[in-house]
Amino acid sequence: KVVCIIGRYVDQHSLEVVSMGSYPSSGLKKGVVVNIDATTDAIQKSLDQAQASFEGKIKNVYVGIAGNHIRSLNSHGIVGIKDKEVEASDIDRVIEAAQAVAIPSDQRVLHVLPQEYVIDNQDSIREPLGMSGVRLESHVHLVTCANNAIQNIEKCVKRCGIGVDGFVLEQLASSYSVLSEDEKELGVCLVDIGGGTTDIAVFNSGSISFTGVIPIAG
C-alpha cells in the first residue's frame, strides 16, 4: 500500500501528524515500482485521502524508499585541519573524503550518515566544530540505492502534480519516530516489517552502524 502522512512542525525537532491517507497498490512489489500507472493511482488516492481533512495544498513531499536494491557500507575519510581549528569547511571536506568510494554505475548515494569524528587520535567526537587539532577523520555509514528505483518513484509522484524534496531510507525514517536517544546510545536493532520488505537498522553509541533489507515481509 501507499501511505501519505501530513505533519506540522511542533518545534525544530518534532512533528505532529495532522492527517493521513492510505490506499492499496498492485504497482509496488518488494518496495519497488513494477507498474507506473497503478502506483501513480495509489499515490493520488492516498494524497486525496490525506488532503480531505487538511486545510491546505500539499506541493512537495519526502518519499520513503526501501527494496532489495538498497546497499550500505561503513567508510572513513581523513583531511588536514587548515587553520588548526575545525571549521565547517573542514567537516564538509572530511565527509566528502569518506564518501569517495567506488559504487556501481547503476547506484547513487542516498545517505551519508556520520558516526563519529576523530581529531589527532581522540575518538568518539560527535561535534568537532571549533575543536583544535591538525588531522580530522570521519567515520560514516553510506547508503546507496538503484538509480532506476528512484527515477520510477519520482516519476509516479510527479505525475500526481507533486514535487519531491528528497528520499529517505524507510528504516531511518522509522527510527526518528520510535527510538529514543537513550536507546540509540545503549544499542538497539530496529526491525520494520512492511508489506513487501523487512527493513533493519542497528544503532550503537548514538549512531547508525548497519542497515539492511530482507525481501520478505508480513
Model-derived features: positions:
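Conserved A3 ("GATE") glycine/threonine-rich loop of ANL adenylate-forming enzymes
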Residues: 1, 174, 196
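Short beta-strand scaffold segments in enzyme catalytic cores
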Residues: 2-7, 198-202
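Nucleotide/phosphate-binding catalytic cleft detector across ATP-hydrolyzing
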Residues: 5-190, 207-211
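Glycine-rich phosphate-binding loop of actin/hexokinase-like ATP-binding domains
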Residues: 186-218
